[in-house]
């Protein structure tokens, strides 16, 4: 079972709002997920990112693979650097 950290779309037509979720890669985009770790709202200017750092780092440590888009979000928020080079 491959675990991914990915975006699940919500919101109205033409006004997307995304939940950052941990899910099995075989599940549908907006289907079943294991845990919700944050949100992403691209409609705001600038875009709003709300991620729970502890949960995200925990899942990355367990081997969950972020999608390319989520990886870019993690870099913008600063979580990816904490995962790649943990404080000694």
UniProtKB/Swiss-Prot annotation:
The keyword Cell cycle is annotated on this UniProt entry: no
GO molecular function, one term: structural constituent of ribosome
Keyword Ribonucleoprotein attributed: yes
UniProt keywords, alphabetically: Ribonucleoprotein, Ribosomal protein
Gene Ontology CC: cytoplasm; small ribosomal subunit
Pfam families: Ribosomal_S16
Gene Ontology process terms (BP): translation
Tree of life domain: Bacteria
Family from the record: Belongs to the bacterial ribosomal protein bS16 family.
NCBIfam families attached to this UniProt entry: S16
UniProt protein name: Small ribosomal subunit protein bS16
UniProt source species: Citrifermentans bemidjiense (strain ATCC BAA-1014 / DSM 16622 / JCM 12645 / Bem) (Geobacter bemidjiensis)
């Amino acid at each position: 079972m491959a675990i991914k950290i990915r975006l699940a779309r919500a919101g109205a037509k033409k006004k997307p709002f995304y939940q950052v979720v941990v899910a099995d890669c075989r599940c549908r985009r907006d289907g079943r997920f294991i845990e919700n770790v944050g949100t992403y709202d691209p409609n705001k200017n600038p875009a709003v990112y709300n991620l729970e750092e502890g949960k995200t780092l925990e899942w990355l440590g367990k081997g969950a693979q972020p999608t390319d888009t989520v990886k870019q979000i993690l870099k913008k928020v600063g979580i990816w650097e904490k995962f790649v080079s943990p404080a000694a």
